[in-house]
Regions:
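C-terminal ends and interior cores of transmembrane alpha-helices
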Residues: 113-128, 345-358
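Extracytoplasmic
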Residues: 40-67, 152-153, 287-295
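Central cavity-lining transmembrane alpha-helices of secondary-active solute carriers
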Residues: 79-97, 313-326, 405
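Helix-to-loop junctions at the C-terminal end of transmembrane segments
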Residues: 91-104, 322-335, 417
Length: 454
């Protein structure tokens, strides 16, 4: 999925010009020929986007795995997403203050260390065979990722020419999407394969011993991820990342600057945009969280969990493809609001089609939703902060907090699935997309229309 936007809005990129997105501004100190390259620090930052995208996507593997081990209802299984994305709502504002105090580079290192600690906490949770012990591990992991995102995003926004900032952000988020496909594809089957035991070996185990084997399947992958995060923190520590001043990039250069109303909360297009972020993240996460169980249903494909994990990864692969296409073509050629509305309408229709069908038709239509999700986050974000001027920082914080939709909507769908069935529960994401379509068509322009009429 997409990372949290920086607390300072990137200027819009020109729809016609395509300068090197990695070149620094001409006024940058130490420039050679007016255009030094920030390729090395941007490569390091892109690796961070890749890692937190992958770690987040593994929740979609954990949910069916833990649901099977502990015989959980859908609602209880969604405690994974409730804990993980609930952390965004709790920790985003404190993380921003923390990073502002210690600096962005140190913030990145602390975020990586926190995420590594969270991964290591999976080991004792699995040893104890306690579902609820996984929740503190997820909270610590998510806290590390929140700090990481708050610290890393401003670098991407300012390392290069202002007119190509959105291009850099979208391309960097594409690598985040790449990880959301790669991790479930290559790490997911390791977790879901019951520690590599054959069916004959599993048959010889008592239920208690089998549960122990299943729980231990998460230990090695997450310890490996902790080591990778630790290594990455050392690389960042040794890297010479330039110092940046976000106070000089507050978005006040917007051509559509609106009258100052004293607070970001007084701009309706921002508040409704936050609802859009809530709906988008909630719908995307809810669908991804339940796909493995969905593919397991006999009226869909009846797939085993390890095979379902590989198919689920295609949902995130579609998001990656769509993000590359959107950043390089769609959003450069067409009105962003109309593009957002079209994507949301088609996504809603695809979900409804999946609900009304079975077999491969249901599978292909729900997986294709990932393609439509691809441009929603950056487009909603850009439309929502447009014209806020000096309130852009506050507006960005409001949008970040709205990511808690990734906790609320999946939990509600879990309750719906328990009460009415998994198949019909996907109607909830379809409703979310209807709201996003309205925002793309009408909601984002409400304050601009009021300004024009005054």
């Amino acid at each position: 999925m997409a990372g949290i936007p920086s607390t300072s809005a990137p200027p819009k990129s020109s729809p016609t010009a395509s300068p090197n997105p990695f070149a620094a501004p001409r006024t940058s100190p130490g420039s050679v020929g007016g255009q030094p390259s920030y390729l090395v620090p941007l490569s390091v930052l892109t690796t961070l986007f890749f890692m937190w995208g992958g770690l987040t996507s593994l929740n979609d593997v954990l949910i069916p795995h833990l649901k099977g081990i502990f015989a959980l209802s859908y609602a209880r299984a969604m405690a994974v997403q409730l804990t993980f994305f609930g952390t965004y709502g709790v920790m985003s504002i404190p993380a921003g203050s923390f990073v502002k105090k210690i600096g962005f580079k140190k913030g990145i290192i602390v975020g990586l260390a926190g995420a590594a600690l969270g991964c290591l906490m999976f080991y004792p949770a699995a040893t104890a065979q306690s579902f609820w012990l996984f929740m503190p591990a997820l909270f610590v992991l998510a806290t590390g990722i929140v700090i990481l995102q708050v610290a890393a995003n401003p670098f991407v926004a300012v390392l290069g020419r202002p007119e190509t900032a959105s291009s850099r952000l979208t391309l960097t988020q594409a690598f985040n999407s790449l990880a959301t496909w790669a991790f479930p594809t290559f790490i997911g089957p390791i977790i879901l394969a019951v520690a590599g035991l054959s069916a004959a070996e599993l048959a010889k185990l008592t239920p208690e011993a089998r549960h122990a084997q299943e729980a231990s399947a998460v230990q090695l992958p997450y310890v490996g991820l902790a080591l990778a995060l630790g290594l990455l923190s050392l690389i960042v520590w040794r890297s010479k990342l330039p110092k940046i001043d976000t106070d000089s990039a507050d978005g006040t250069n917007s051509a559509n600057l609106l009258p100052d109303r004293g607070s970001a909360w007084k701009y309706r297009h921002l508040v409704w945009g936050a609802v859009g972020i809530f709906m988008y993240v909630g719908a995307e996460v809810a669908i991804g969280s339940l796909l493995v169980n969905y593919f397991k249903e006999p009226y869909i494909l009846g797939l085993a969990e390890d095979k379902g994990s590989k198919l689920m990864a295609k949902y995130w692969l579609c998001a990656m493809i769509g993000r590359f296409v959107g950043s390089l073509f769609t959003l450069r050629k067409f009105n962003p609001g109309k593009v957002l509305a079209a994507h949301a309408v088609i996504a809603s229709l695809l979900v409804v089609t999946s609900v009304l069908t079975t077999g491969w038709t249901a599978v292909l239509t729900i997986v294709a939703v990932g393609l439509l999700n691809s441009i929603m986050f950056p487009t909603i974000f850009t439309l929502a902060i447009d014209g806020l001027g000096r309130h852009t920082e506050q507006g960005s914080g409001i949008l970040c907090a709205a990511i808690i939709g990734g906790a609320a909507i999946p939990f509600l769908q879990g309750l719906f699935a328990d009460a009415a069935g998994l198949h019909i529960s996907f109607i909830l994401p379809a409703v979310c997309y209807v709201y996003i379509a309205w925002y793309g068509l009408k909601g984002h322009a409400v304050d601009a229309r009021a300004k024009a009429a005054s």
